[in-house]
Amino acid sequence: MGVNKNNVKIHVEHLKKNFGKLEVLKDVSTDIYEGEVVVILGPSGSGKSTFLRCLNRLEEITGGEVVVDGHDLTDKKTDLNKVRENVGMVFQHFNLFNNLNVMGNMMLAPVELKKASKAEAKERALHLLDRVGLAEKAEAYPAQLSGGQKQRVAIARALAMNPDIMLFDEPTSALDPEMVGEVLQVMKQLAADGMTMVVVTHEMGFAREVG
């Protein structure tokens, strides 16, 4: 599947973000199309993660416009929770719930937010765990998983909401080098399947592989 230039999934215009007097993002404008994989590179402290977090308004926006799937995130009338249901996010440190097993982590959002039945949510969770090569870990707890396995579960958990867009914030930087490949493989398959992806990283080789 290729990039659909007729469908802008994310439109950013003159985006500004300040932390107090510190200007982190200055007049950023871009369009991200359906099926496109955009890799954001740069050294630590250059505003990569801040930009990513503005795309689902986990960071408040100082100025400019961010439109996701036709919804203006700077408009007070926009239901941010509804928009976020269609934007999956994978964090550097996995952010799994340690008190829930893998299946519990996978089923929580679809059941609570999308009102899926437990049977539906379980079926989809098992399908996604199989897709990321972790079907046998459904009953395991996060403490029993390696870093690479945790990140693959985190990706599968985000996919459980059936998002149109996936945001990745430094998805491999907390992993041991030998575990990077297994996460990269899942992301490459997502890209091949036509998922719209925005990936923040400082690893050039990783960026070349995914982008």
Regions found by a protein language model. Give the residues of each.
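ABC family nucleotide-binding domain
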Residues: 5-211
